[in-house]
């Protein structure tokens, strides 16, 4: 359906097990769908950054798209990242054709202006975590370990 509306290559980054099943069941794709075997993390990020939109079932796609600034759609039926939905970073559609196409149309209208989740932009997370950890050591020692 996507290939009927958009005239550009569709890259399907597939796990080797998925490629094996595609071959096993004789699944054929339209001409502009290209199966790509897994690539390095940096190459995959480069692919996402230079694509029109990434469709993924990854649990971290909301964070990745917000932090790196690329358009993405979460193909899961549910998700653990409501903060991304609240600001419109990464809609989740499941495998619903209409929802996917609607989201792609919205990205087409919006262009490269992708909203950010402010929680993901904190720069001092390591310091905060260390302070929290250090603060809890006396409490845990006293009430958990009875030291």
Residue ranges and their predicted role:
Residues 1-8, 12-13, 18-147:
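Nucleotide-activated sugar donor-binding and catalytic core shared by glycosyltransferases
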């Amino acid at each position: 359906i996507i290939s009927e509306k958009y005239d550009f290559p569709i890259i399907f980054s597939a796990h080797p097990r998925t490629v094996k099943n595609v071959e096993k069941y004789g699944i054929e794709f339209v001409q502009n769908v290209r199966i790509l075997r897994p690539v390095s993390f940096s190459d995959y990020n480069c692919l996402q950054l230079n694509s029109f939109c990434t469709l993924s079932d990854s649990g971290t796609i909301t964070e990745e798209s917000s932090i790196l600034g690329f358009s993405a759609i979460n193909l899961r039926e549910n998700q653990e990242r409501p903060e991304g939905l609240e600001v419109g970073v990464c809609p989740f559609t499941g495998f619903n054709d209409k929802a996917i196409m609607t989201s792609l149309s919205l990205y087409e209208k919006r262009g490269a202006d992708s909203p950010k989740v402010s929680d993901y932009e904190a720069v001092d997370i390591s310091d905060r975590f260390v302070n929290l950890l250090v603060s809890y050591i006396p409490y845990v020692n006293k009430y958990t370990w009875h030291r």
